[in-house]
Amino acid sequence: MTKYIFVTGGVVSSIGKGIVAASLGRLLKNRGLKVTIQKFDPYINIDPGTMSPYQHGEVYVTDDGAETDLDLGHYERFIDINLNKYSNVTTGKIYSEVLRKERKGEYLGATVQVIPHITDALKDKIKRAATTTDSDVVITEVGGTVGDIESLPFLEALRQMKADVGSDNVMYIHTTLLPYLKAAGEMKTKPTQHSVKELRGLGIQPNMLVIRTEEPAGQGIKNKLAQFCDVAPEAVIESLDVEHIYQVPLNMQAQGMDQIVCDHLKLNAPAADMTEWSAMVDKVLNLKKTTKIALVGKYVELHDAYLSVVEALKHSGLANDTAIDIDWVNANDLTAENVASRLADADGIIVPGGFGQRGTEGKIQAIRYARENDVPMLGVCLGMQLTCIEFARHVLHLDGANSAELDPETQYPIIDIMRDQIDIEDMGGTLRLGLYPCKLKPGSKAAAAYGNQEVVQRRHRHRYEFNTKFREQFEAEGFVFSGVSPDNRLMEVVELPDKKFFVAAQYHPEYHSRPNHAEELYSAFVTAAVENAK
């Protein structure tokens, strides 16, 4: 029988529910259990695919092409699993599906209501997360905080799950803030008590509290919360601020969190062996060397817009025994006049993805600087497309070369829309999304990075492609297409072999990076940056 764990939040948002859920997932996986995890987002958007990165941070793409919340990146990196489209559910997605069924007459003329139709659809997503992965445990995080109007159908669905599958198969974990008032010199439990009261008013009694705090709470505070919130004292778990998020699973294990969960759910599983994870964390905290990477982006004010890129760089730093110092460079501010001085201190330059015109000329200046000064450079998605445009302008001398996305009237559309996308007007869900194979060119830097594999599979999120009409011109000047689709129609990876490392990929390598296994192309880039720093 599959077990279901529901993680809710109270008092404030952004309290770290996702890290708590991911940490628990890692602990249960290391006990030998098969775990999957999902995020419920109560907003009305179908998915975050068309949301501004300033609103929501990065869009995380799964193998099957779902555009999802950035928390899924945490889940995959912590637990080292690949999730699917059932791992991110929004209000908009649920209502869209229910309304589509209503229009088709699938409800046989019934009055369609929040209960049972919306709640049943939500429960179906929870159960499908289990059946599509054959998991022992499903962990579901609900976004927002208890008391939000938009969360009510989600919490009702969670309440009903207990009756549907039995109390021994369901566990509710509530994450709250335990504020510390410096003036009074004490921690305040009332916000947590009121949050639990609100949750109980909706029919959910939490089985465990996870309290986010800056200072150790002490047993007295835990006993007080246990008494007034009706949970066992040992089931009040501290989530202290830490130097690195990968410390959290170890802190949770030290407090017996995973054992309490297993006892409640009657899971007979051996203790989690966290030796490898602990060694990784110890290494992260004791790196002596630092490598400076300039990240040239258009959303650099919000670092979460590049969360997976940053994590992949850190993982690659770990693989190369170096800490990564990210220099956040706003592409909008880069010009031909200031690019050399702005990037002079960089050991390596990364140009990540993005959409739209803003900042593209600055990114092109950064790419040109990297090429002309032989600074290791990695381009990703739009970064790959702009790498091609920069080469066309300054090496092939195709003045005005551009992407048809950025300049529909360009004489040289180096990047053009995919043929099957020409008549599509909707923006959402119309990209090339998900896992696709890439055939690597033997002897190339890309092939070397991937251990000379013939084919790798990586996730994509883009609409435009390199225009193969220009391929021969590029190759005549030493530009190598080192990764292509198996049918040779789509250009996936490009590089200049005479440079230390000048490689760009149309796909998003960062989605495959894990703390205990850095993504290979990122790792090769950081290796080159480390060498460049010497």
Curated annotation (Swiss-Prot):
Note: CTPSs have evolved a hybrid strategy for distinguishing between UTP and CTP. The overlapping regions of the product feedback inhibitory and substrate sites recognize a common feature in both compounds, the triphosphate moiety. To differentiate isosteric substrate and product pyrimidine rings, an additional pocket far from the expected kinase/ligase catalytic site, specifically recognizes the cytosine and ribose portions of the product inhibitor.
Keyword Glycosyltransferase: no
Pfam family for this entry, one: CTP_synth_N
Pathway: Pyrimidine metabolism; CTP biosynthesis via de novo pathway; CTP from UDP: step 2/2
Chain positions recorded as L-glutamine binding sites: 54, 354, 382-385, 405, 463
Region named Amidoligase domain: 1-267
Protein's UniProt keywords contain Secreted: no
Alphabetical GO biological process terms: 'de novo' CTP biosynthetic process; pyrimidine nucleobase biosynthetic process
Catalytic center residues: 381, 508, 510
Catalyzed reactions: UTP + L-glutamine + ATP + H2O = CTP + L-glutamate + ADP + phosphate + 2 H(+); L-glutamine + H2O = L-glutamate + NH4(+); UTP + NH4(+) + ATP = CTP + ADP + phosphate + 2 H(+)
Regulation: Allosterically activated by GTP, when glutamine is the substrate; GTP has no effect on the reaction when ammonia is the substrate. The allosteric effector GTP functions by stabilizing the protein conformation that binds the tetrahedral intermediate(s) formed during glutamine hydrolysis. Inhibited by the product CTP, via allosteric rather than competitive inhibition.
Physiological role: Catalyzes the ATP-dependent amination of UTP to CTP with either L-glutamine or ammonia as the source of nitrogen. Regulates intracellular CTP levels through interactions with the four ribonucleotide triphosphates.
InterPro entries hit by this protein: Class_I_gatase-like (IPR029062), CTP_synthase (IPR004468), CTP_synthase_N (IPR017456), GATASE (IPR017926), GATase1_CTP_Synthase (IPR033828), P-loop_NTPase (IPR027417)
Name of the protein described by the UniProt record: CTP synthase
EC number, UniProt record: 6.3.4.2
Positions that bind UTP: 13, 188-193, 224
Assigned keywords, A-Z: ATP-binding, Glutamine amidotransferase, Ligase, Magnesium, Metal-binding, Nucleotide-binding, Pyrimidine biosynthesis
